[in-house]
């Protein structure tokens, strides 16, 4: 069975280059060496462009090269002036302060990942961290009010869910007999309590 790993080959196909060249009506026959030379020139050009763009990316302490990095590289290097029209629509590079702010956001996102597990358990873990980070007492009070309301919403939601199944237990007692047998002694008294509930309904009406 042949191996699936292929050697990386960044060479541009001379046959494709020859076809592109021959689309121009002014070009007739093309010598065999010409597409090979153009292919190699294209490799060298891309290598120099990417090295310069990589330097720009590293100078910004970024891990991912973006179109903004390429644009800045093209604007800084005179040899790439002919590419300025291609990158005219690309947004400009952000300033150093904004970049540092973005890096801080990335760090904050990384910091929240462990807290995301806390959200599954009720969401209180990340909010308590936010309290520690906020500087003023008024902000902490606002956040504590938010957490209190969130807590009330969270606690108010589970009881209705719990009450719905209990309503099902009381209304059809026969299908739930096996489930009732697992409960301790209290299932026996519900028989007499059912008339009490009906009596209470009579009093209410």
From Swiss-Prot:
Single GO MF annotation: protein heterodimerization activity
Feature: compositional bias, Basic and acidic residues: 98-108
Region (Disordered): 91-205
Keywords: DNA-binding, Nucleus, Phosphoprotein, Repressor, Transcription, Transcription regulation
Single GO cellular component term: nucleus
Family annotation (CDD domains): HFD_DRAP1
Coiled-coil parts of chain: none
Bias (Pro residues) ranges: 184-193
Free-text tissue specificity from the UniProt record: Ubiquitous. Highly expressed in adult testis, heart, skeletal muscle, pancreas and brain, and in fetal brain, liver and kidney.
Subcellular location(s) per record: Nucleus
Any matching Pfam family: CBFD_NFYB_HMF
Occurrences of domain Histone-fold (ranges): 14-77
Family recorded in the similarity comment: Belongs to the NC2 alpha/DRAP1 family.
Quaternary context: Heterodimer with DR1. Binds BTAF1.
Function: The association of the DR1/DRAP1 heterodimer with TBP results in a functional repression of both activated and basal transcription of class II genes. This interaction precludes the formation of a transcription-competent complex by inhibiting the association of TFIIA and/or TFIIB with TBP. Can bind to DNA on its own.
Protein name: Dr1-associated corepressor
Gene: DRAP1
């Amino acid at each position: 069975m042949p191996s699936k790993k292929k050697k990386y080959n960044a060479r541009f196909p001379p046959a494709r280059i020859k076809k592109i060249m021959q689309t121009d009506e002014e070009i007739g026959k093309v010598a065999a060496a010409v597409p090979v030379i153009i292919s190699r020139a294209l490799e060298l050009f891309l290598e120099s462009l990417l090295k310069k763009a990589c330097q720009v990316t590293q100078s910004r302490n970024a891990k991912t090269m973006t179109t903004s990095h390429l644009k800045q590289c093209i604007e800084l290097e005179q040899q790439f002036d002919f590419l300025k029209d291609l990158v005219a629509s690309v947004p400009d590079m952000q300033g150093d302060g904004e970049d540092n702010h973005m890096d801080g956001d990335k760090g904050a996102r990384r910091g929240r990942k462990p807290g995301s597990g806390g959200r599954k358990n009720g969401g209180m873990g990340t909010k308590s961290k936010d309290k520690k980070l906020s500087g003023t007492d008024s902000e902490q009070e606002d956040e504590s009010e938010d957490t209190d309301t969130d807590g009330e919403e969270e606690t108010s939601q589970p009881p209705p869910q719990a009450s719905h199944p209990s309503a099902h237990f009381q209304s059809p007692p026969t299908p739930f007999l096996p489930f009732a047998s697992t409960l301790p002694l209290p299932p026996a008294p519900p028989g007499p309590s059912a008339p009490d509930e009906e009596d209470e309904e009579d009093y209410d009406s």
